């Protein structure tokens, strides 16, 4: 689009040499140059990058099994957490999920956790422009962390902070809590550096297997012995702690441990 060049205008001196001295030359008239339109007016508002664009979401618990968000979904907010994947024993855990759902079906409507992992952070919120820098900080913090082979042991019942959901989980064997805490500490420091909430204190490392809506802690504790019998049929539940993952929305970063 070509911009119009608004020049100033003035009256010229008389070109007629015969003009008498009694005729006065008109005073110069200065016109102000009109202000050019701003770029936003011509080009429209700045468009977000494709990665930043997230449609406004109206949270409807009916669309995801009655779950409620712990924080409001807003454009530019990326739900973020750090975890260790439970890939080494995923087949055994999925078999337990199927058997437990069938066993408790008359009492509760249980849902399986689809991404089986051991959390090393709370779910926090990052802005899009923070993600890469946060990932680099986390990678640097974990550079000296050593991996190890661990196991899961038994079952335990948890609720979320709002007590709107109840979980059946397999805790980390107590023999490996100290080593897992050594990995957690630099992660907590990164969270602190970014003014984000640190992990629970005291930490309770576990892999969530099943969940249901509402506070069903009492009922599930009554069924815990029965559920443990299902898990006892499984071989040792191994957990390979050789890498840590960062999940930011649909982005996943992996950091190998020594």
Swiss-Prot record:
GO biological process per UniProt: U6 snRNA 3'-end processing
Record: residues binding UMP: 200, 204-208
Example of a GO cellular component annotation carried by this entry: nucleus
Gene3D superfamilies in the cross-refs: Cyclic phosphodiesterase
Binding site for AMP: 117-119, 200, 202-208
Pfam families: HVSL
UniProt keyword Nuclease, yes or no: yes
Catalysis performed (reactions): a 3'-end uridylyl-uridine-RNA = a 3'-end 2',3'-cyclophospho-uridine-RNA + uridine
GO MF terms, alphabetically ordered: 3'-5'-RNA exonuclease activity; lyase activity; poly(U)-specific exoribonuclease activity, producing 3' uridine cyclic phosphate ends
Localisation: Nucleus
Main location: nucleus
Function (record text): 3'-5' RNA exonuclease that trims the 3' end of oligo(U) tracts of the pre-U6 small nuclear RNA (snRNA) molecule, leading to the formation of a mature U6 snRNA 3' end-terminated with a 2',3'-cyclic phosphate. Participates in the U6 snRNA 3' end processing that prevents U6 snRNA degradation.
HAMAP family: USB1
Protein known as: U6 snRNA phosphodiesterase 1
Organism this protein belongs to: Drosophila melanogaster (Fruit fly)
């Amino acid at each position: 689009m070509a911009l119009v060049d608004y020049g100033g205008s003035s009256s010229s001196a008389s070109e007629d040499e015969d003009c008498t001295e009694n005729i006065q030359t008109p005073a110069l008239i200065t016109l102000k140059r009109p202000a050019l339109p701003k770029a936003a007016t011509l080009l429209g508002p700045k468009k977000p990058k494709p990665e930043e664009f997230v449609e406004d979401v109206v949270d409807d618990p009916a669309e995801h099994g009655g779950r409620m968000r712990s924080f409001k979904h807003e454009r530019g907010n990326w739900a973020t957490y750090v975890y260790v994947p439970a890939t080494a024993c995923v087949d055994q855990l999925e078999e337990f999920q199927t058997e437990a759902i069938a066993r408790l079906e008359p009492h509760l409507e249980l849902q399986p956790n689809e991404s089986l992992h051991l959390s090393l952070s709370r779910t926090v919120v990052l802005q899009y422009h923070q993600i890469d820098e946060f990932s680099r900080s986390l990678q640097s913090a974990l550079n000296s962390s050593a991996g190890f082979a661990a196991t899961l042991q038994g079952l335990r019942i948890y609720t979320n902070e709002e007590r709107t959901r109840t979980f059946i989980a397999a805790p980390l064997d107590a023999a490996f809590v100290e080593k897992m805490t050594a990995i957690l500490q630099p992660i907590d420091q990164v969270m602190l550096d970014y003014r984000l909430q640190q992990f629970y204190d005291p930490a309770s490392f576990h892999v969530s297997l099943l969940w249901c809506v509402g506070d069903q802690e009492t009922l599930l504790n009554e069924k815990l012995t029965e559920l443990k019998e299902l898990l006892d049929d499984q071989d040792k539940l191994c957990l390979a702690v050789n890498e840590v993952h960062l999940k930011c929305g649909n982005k996943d970063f992996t950091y190998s441990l020594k």
